[in-house]
Design a protein with these regions (language model features):
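Terminal ABC-like ATPase head and other globular end-domains that cap long coiled-coil arms
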Residues: 1-129
Length: 129
């Protein structure tokens, strides 16, 4: 079933982004989301805005993988505004590992600094001031 696969894939992505803090994401039939840290269930209303944004990122990436047979480019526009530096780094590592073409639009320098620190792939930067 698509719902089970979506939960599994989104959980896998979220666990990687959060450094294993959240081991499972469950989206029920009413589209209510819950997180699990170990055996403890947490409603998403109890987590930070950054974690909520990471949940949505994981769900979007999982849905994209499940719905498209071919690899699609990933286009992100100020997606990481509420991420802390560690989770941003984890997310950029995940993107580099699993995605072939990623376009990141942002008004911040953090993404560029972390990508350079990690020496991830080929990068082209356009600065508009």
């Amino acid at each position: 079933e698509l719902g089970v696969k979506l939960n599994e894939k989104a959980s896998e992505i979220l666990s990687e982004i959060t450094g294993g803090k959240y081991t499972m994401l469950l989206i029920d039939e009413k589209l209510k989301m819950s997180l699990y840290t170990g055996q403890r269930k947490i409603g998403i209303e109890q987590v930070s805005r950054g974690t909520i944004e990471q949940i949505y990122f994981a769900v979007r990436m999982a849905a994209s993988e499940l719905l498209h047979e071919e690899e699609c480019p990933v286009i992100l526009d100020d997606t990481f505004v509420f991420y802390d530096d560690q989770r941003l780094e984890n997310t950029l590592k995940w993107l580099a590992k699993y995605k072939k073409q990623v376009l990141i639009f942002t008004c911040q320098k953090r993404e560029q600094q972390i990508l350079e620190k990690l020496e991830i792939g080929e990068k082209n930067y356009v600065n508009e001031n």
